[in-house]
Amino acid sequence: GWPLGMPLVEHLGGEIWEVRTKLGNRIVRVLFATEGQTMVLLHGFIKKQQKTPGPDLDLAKDRLKQLKRR
């Protein structure tokens, strides 16, 4: 399995995970899922508030659904 956990990675629910990092003075997040041994990057954004914004999480979920339909 993947060695995932805080403080760098947080499970947001279902199959969606969030990688946390900083880019200069900005807080950056990348939402991803795993398919076997592959990490699938779904959406990245600069975070401006404490909680992951709903539209960003929804976009990642939609992209994961599209991927699974293939």
Per-segment meaning from a language model:
Residues 1-27, 36-39, 46-70:
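Basic, Lys/Arg-enriched alpha-helical interface segments
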